Amino acid sequence: MAKRPLLLLLLAVWVLAGELWLRTEARASPYGVKLCGREFIRAVIFTCGGSRWRRSDMLAHEALGDVFSDTDSNADSELDEAMASSEWLALTKSPETFYGVQPGWQRTPGALRGSRDVLAGLSSNCCKWGCSKSEISSLC
């Protein structure tokens, strides 16, 4: 008969230990969520809010739509001519002159590569150990 209470006590300890183990497994990792590949890129785009820019452009366009509703058709043709001439001018200039690239950038190709290295490091760490939303938002 002494075996029965001991067996029940052992069973109770085993159930409580199993429940405790399940609780620790269900908790989020202290490093955040593990994201690899496409999931990481999607999380960066979602966190940085790429579509927010398009929404703000559309709202600004709708707000200005009523202001320019009574323009004449001659202005449209003048705008087309101006765009054609600016496109022609863009083709005649070098890309550095047209875009205003600073000459120092041409001498240091590694300077632009630094941000890619940060992205690669964070993406590999996020895949291995997980990362938080604040770490992902540091890329914005």
Curated annotation (Swiss-Prot):
Give any Gene Ontology cellular component.
Answer: extracellular region
- Propeptide part(s) removed at maturation, as residue ranges: 56-116
What the entry lists under InterPro entries is as follows: Insulin-like, Insulin-like_neuro_ligands, Insulin-like_sf, Insulin_CS, Insulin_family
Subcellular location per UniProt equals: Secreted
Name the record gives this protein: Relaxin-3
Question: Is Secreted included in the keywords of this UniProt record?
Answer: yes
**Which CDD domains has this protein been placed in?**
IlGF_relaxin_like
Pfam families xref list: Insulin
Q: Which Gene3D superfamilies match?
A: Insulin-like
Per the UniProt entry, the signal peptide is 1-26
Tell me yes or no: is Signal among this UniProt entry's keywords.
yes
Alphabetically sorted, this entry's keywords are: Cleavage on pair of basic residues, Disulfide bond, Hormone, Secreted, Signal
Q: Function of this protein? A: May play a role in neuropeptide signaling processes. Ligand for LGR7, RXFP3 and RXFP4.
The main location is secreted
Give GO terms: molecular function aspect only. G protein-coupled receptor binding; hormone activity
Q: Spell out the subunit comment.
A: Heterodimer of a B chain and an A chain linked by two disulfide bonds.
Quote the SUPFAM superfamilies the UniProt record gives: Insulin-like
Q: Which family does it belong to?
A: Belongs to the insulin family.
The record's disulfide annotation reads 36-127, 48-140, 126-131
Q: Which organism is it from?
A: Sus scrofa
